[in-house]
């Protein structure tokens, strides 16, 4: 198995290096004058037409990397990283700088960012060199400086297209590409944002330059021209208008204040892609096709998963007015700590989906999955109101879980978890995973220090969620956990506690259409996902070959100047979408049929379960004095916790005191200021053994 893994990895590296080499060379005069004529002779066949070269050089390698990555990740389900690889990962994951607006930048991020910027600068330089010194396009008989001005606008649009070749990789939730470099879709959203800013800037400059150029030569109406055999300018204008709307509403100042406008506007991306492809044509579309193709496979599979209703078992309303929802799941569904689950409640919004942190462990809780929801914003407020009312069921759809492909919580000698407010939720799943690993006596567990900050005393109810209710003393006896809790806005413990602050649990009636959350194509079924990617892409190649050879070629004869320019791009989009729809649907339905027996067994179990009425349980030990003292989970929490009032944690002191240990893992989740403070401490010269990792809820 190790040899197979090495072989697959080598093939992926070779394909990727070749793909990058093409991107480096494609802007050069050597590629344009020497390579292109030879490549076109063999690759621009009657079956693929003018798009053949880009299809073979820039689409095929990345699609096969995606297929091979499915095989690689399937082999690596239980990873055993060599010590050399692990040391390299630590070095490349070290924080290099902490600064706004980039945030926390690691060595890996800085390296790849500099290389990507170098690629953009290299490409722009070579494109301009071609225009200014080799062949200056001047069909309008404009002045030389005007023609050069136009060339600059055209070439910077080409640079924006390079950004689009990577734009959708970070937001493909069940991506098989991101795990290869240790990333998840949630942690990669910032790269999507950076690429979006750069590409929109390039396209805006491209548009403005052409508007000025056309105004200078008295052809401003070219903005609305739609040439049937050449680039349709109107399509580009429409795409730019949509792009500006998406860009403006995605800016942090706008997005955080008016999230729903941002959310709905961002769903115009489909329309943006359509007009963009019509504008640039099929050949240029093939340059960016892999990330769009993989994104839409992921998007359609997510849609298929979301059509099922998930079985909501119970809801706990915490004294802090936050919620814990528990769903039923099949034992075969596995996920890693710090994973997230997307929720959709049709009675609140027909189209909105929101991500929430999973607090359970799939190795500890085989049949249930829990998420914690902070009451913040209109959607969560409506959900809280629904659950607080006298309902006995709630229709919920889920999507996910999504998280790291691997997460070895016991890889460090000691572990420091720093959280602020609801940032504690990812660490609940980490601690529960450690409890699961503690059942294996041969596993060495790290010492765990949880440093958590809350605004108010009642927020300590989050600590009630750390241990499952059915834990015994033997289950947690090997876990060395210490909790330092800080209450920043209160100087002492409140003398009285209102009744409404008690922890309440509500149980829901099972409904006939409810199903447990089950594995879908992706992290739990990499090979089946590989089948979808391979079959849909091969089908696309076959269909585009048939259409080109027997429908387009008899009209155009590979001249590129007779058959409608826009139709070529539309054919690519239509056939690609059809292949994704057919292949994904067939494989998904096949997998659904295989899981049908498990669903039947689940429904039989559900029908035999007696419905429990809503209860106001004794509540948190912080608030409900009626809590039974012999309750093992809460007794353990009390013994492990020290509460500090009216102060914030001295993170520098805490972290540097622990730095003397041989290997200390530091994870932080909370406000930006807290994350940046911890990152600066871990990256300072005083801390050599602190290995930093951040989790963020906002972007």
Swiss-Prot record:
Catalytic activity: 2 a Fe(II)-siderophore + NAD(+) + H(+) = 2 a Fe(III)-siderophore + NADH
GO biological process, one term: monoatomic ion transport
Function: Ferric chelate reductase. May participate in the transport of electrons to a Fe(3+) ion via FAD and heme intermediates. May function as root surface cupric chelate reductase and participate in the reduction of Cu(2+), for Cu(+) acquisition via Cu(+) transporters in response to copper deficiency.
Domain FAD-binding FR-type: 305-408
Tissues in which the protein is found: Expressed in siliques. Detected at low levels in roots, cotyledon veins and shoots.
Keywords attached to this entry: Electron transport, FAD, Flavoprotein, Heme, Ion transport, Iron, Membrane, Metal-binding, NAD, Oxidoreductase, Transmembrane, Transmembrane helix, Transport
SUPFAM superfamilies assigned to the protein according to its UniProt record, in alphabetical order: Ferredoxin reductase-like, C-terminal NADP-linked domain (SSF52343), Riboflavin synthase domain-like (SSF63380)
Record-listed FAD binding positions: 354-357
A single MF term (Gene Ontology): ferric-chelate reductase (NADH) activity
Lumenal side, ranges: 30-54, 126-190, 290-311, 549-568
Primary localization: membrane
Membrane topology of the entry: Multi-pass membrane protein
Membrane-spanning residues: 10-29, 55-73, 102-125, 191-214, 265-289, 312-332, 526-548, 569-590
Stated name of the protein: Ferric reduction oxidase 4
